[in-house]
């Protein structure tokens, strides 16, 4: 509908944004000066922004998107880029550890994967849980310490599995 058309039109013009922060993100993502498509947003720009909220201070993104100076915007964008690489590395390491934990157990895989490690970063366990669902085709819950003495959980499940209903029976 109307929102979809508005987004399509906005994508056509985003690459010509006068905002230094948007320009910096596009440059760091290697998108050049061409019209953007949805995949550019979903796989290049959004992850750089999202990573900051997952493992850093979200104020960084506010500062980036409101920066008026190109050099300052580029430096802030570079910091977002670094956090995105760190986020990817964290996800890969946690996924490898989770797979090793599951594969090292000789018993059959349970119908619901549940893993907890205090050293995992709580900001990325949802991404890893989704990867485990894809790999093992069953619901997965990962828990990580939040730094305040509590564990945070993230649960993902295959399509058609109602996590909220399952949790009501716990």
Predicted regions and their residues:
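Hydrophobic helix-and-loop "lid/oligomerization" segment in the mid-to-C-terminal part
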Residues: 1-170
